[in-house]
């Protein structure tokens, strides 16, 4: 093995090249690699955070949907109760109106009945007076009297 000046020159040049690369080339490459690793790690962390945020938002939306459904069911239930109340009030009002109309009808019937009775009394009184006049016009004959009374009874 011959060591000559060329081999020593090449070794010195290689050592200088390695030193130059370690001093000036390697640090920017390492910085670029580390920056890229950091960006990738940050991106993965952001993705994980986004997934968690999405899950949280979905859970929140599900809760809000359940709450909205519960509120809607409550409103529907209240509306049904109000409807039933209105129907009951209308029935009660209709029953009261019906009772009022029936009472009014009964009162009208009673008034008409009383009027008819009064008319009948007047007619009976008139007939009785007419019968008495006829009896008085004739002689006080018991046979004629009986005949007139029978006619009056037949007319009444």
Swiss-Prot record:
Q: Where mainly located?
A: membrane
What PANTHER family does the record point to? ATP SYNTHASE SUBUNIT B (PTHR33445:SF1), ATP SYNTHASE SUBUNIT B', CHLOROPLASTIC (PTHR33445)
Relate the assembly described in the record. F-type ATPases have 2 components, F(1) - the catalytic core - and F(0) - the membrane proton channel. F(1) has five subunits: alpha(3), beta(3), gamma(1), delta(1), epsilon(1). F(0) has three main subunits: a(1), b(2) and c(10-14). The alpha and beta chains form an alternating ring which encloses part of the gamma chain. F(1) is attached to F(0) by a central stalk formed by the gamma and epsilon chains, while a peripheral stalk is formed by the delta and b chains.
The similarity annotation says: Belongs to the ATPase B chain family.
Record's InterPro entries? ATP_synth_B-like_membr_sf, ATP_synth_b/b'su_bac/chlpt, ATP_synth_F0_bsu_bac, ATP_synthase_B_chain
Q: Does the keyword Cell division apply?
A: no
Which regions span the lipid bilayer? 7-27
Q: How does it sit in the membrane?
A: Single-pass membrane protein
Report the protein name in the record. Answer: ATP synthase subunit b
- Keywords recorded for this protein, A-Z: ATP synthesis, Cell inner membrane, Cell membrane, CF(0), Hydrogen ion transport, Ion transport, Membrane, Transmembrane, Transmembrane helix, Transport
Q: Name one Pfam family in it.
A: ATP-synt_B
Q: Where is this protein localized, as stated in its record?
A: Cell inner membrane
Q: Cellular component per GO?
A: plasma membrane; proton-transporting ATP synthase complex
What is the documented function of this protein?
F(1)F(0) ATP synthase produces ATP from ADP in the presence of a proton or sodium gradient. F-type ATPases consist of two structural domains, F(1) containing the extramembraneous catalytic core and F(0) containing the membrane proton channel, linked together by a central stalk and a peripheral stalk. During catalysis, ATP synthesis in the catalytic domain of F(1) is coupled via a rotary mechanism of the central stalk subunits to proton translocation.
NCBIfam families (alphabetical): ATP_synt_b (TIGR01144), PRK05759.1-2 (NF004411), PRK05759.1-4 (NF004413)
**What would be an example GO MF term here?**
proton-transporting ATPase activity, rotational mechanism
Q: Which domain of life is it from?
A: Bacteria
């Amino acid at each position: 093995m011959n060591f000559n000046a060329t081999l020593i020159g090449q070794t010195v040049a290689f050592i200088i090249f390695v030193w130059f690369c370690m001093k000036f080339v390697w640090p920017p490459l390492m910085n670029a690699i580390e920056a890229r690793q950091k960006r990738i790690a940050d991106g993965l962390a952001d993705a994980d955070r986004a997934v968690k945020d999405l899950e949280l938002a979905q859970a929140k939306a599900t809760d809000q949907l359940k709450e909205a459904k519960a509120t809607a069911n409550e409103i529907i239930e209240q509306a049904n109760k109000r409807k039933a109340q209105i129907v009951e009030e209308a029935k009660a009002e209709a029953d009261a109106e019906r009772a009022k109309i029936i009472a009014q009808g009964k009162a009208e019937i009673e008034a008409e009945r009383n009027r008819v009775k009064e008319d009948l009394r007047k007619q009976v009184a008139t007939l009785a007076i007419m019968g008495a006049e006829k009896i008085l016009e004739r002689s006080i004959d018991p046979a004629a009297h009986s005949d007139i009374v029978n006619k009056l009874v037949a007319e009444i």
